[in-house]
Curated annotation (Swiss-Prot):
Part of the 50S ribosomal subunit. GO terms for molecular function: rRNA binding; structural constituent of ribosome. GO terms for biological process: translation. Belongs to the universal ribosomal protein uL15 family. Binds to the 23S rRNA. This is Large ribosomal subunit protein uL15. The keyword Ion transport does not apply. GO terms for cellular component: cytosolic large ribosomal subunit. HAMAP family: Ribosomal_uL15. Keywords: Ribonucleoprotein, Ribosomal protein, RNA-binding, rRNA-binding. Coiled coil: none annotated. It holds the Pfam family Ribosomal_L27A.
């Protein structure tokens, strides 16, 4: 028996692009939202308003520089007071291990009120002096 069914696609027969304009226009992703246009001409108003520092040279990041996470004595005392840094007891001494809290270096700004044994990778001379003055000690954990 003959199947009576309309053709699936019978519109625009003989019309090369089926109503989608120039060849290939229906095939791609549409307009690209201004990614390909020049900021100096077509999008100048945006560049003036939001694009500060868009043009010109802007330095570089030194690849050999090492970030040091440091803490001063003033901030250390503040964190101890607020229980952000806990004091541990070892052999009857109060010990703070700064490496456990992510600090690499102890700076000498400010003062401590407690004689502490502080374990840290690096410390400034001023920090060493101030900790010794109140009866504390700094144990350097790195070999540098």
């Amino acid at each position: 028996m003959v199947v009576r069914k309309e053709k699936k696609s019978r519109k625009y027969r003989g019309y090369r692009t089926h109503g989608w304009g120039t060849k290939g226009q229906h095939r791609d992703r549409g307009a690209q939202g201004g990614r390909q246009i020049g900021m100096h001409k077509e999008k100048w108003s945006w560049t003036v308003k939001f694009g500060e520092g868009w043009y010109g040279k802007h330095g570089f990041r030194n690849p050999t520089s090492k970030l040091v996470n440091a803490i001063g004595l003033r901030k250390l005392q503040e964190y101890i007071d607020n229980d952000k840094i806990k004091i541990e007891e070892e052999n009857g001494k109060k010990v703070v291990d700064l490496a456990k809290y992510g600090y690499d270096k102890l700076l000498g700004g400010g003062n401590l009120r407690l004689p502490l044994v502080i374990k840290v990778a690096k410390a400034t001379e001023k920090a060493k002096e101030r900790v010794k003055e109140i009866g504390g000690e700094i144990i350097l954990t790195s070999s540098e």
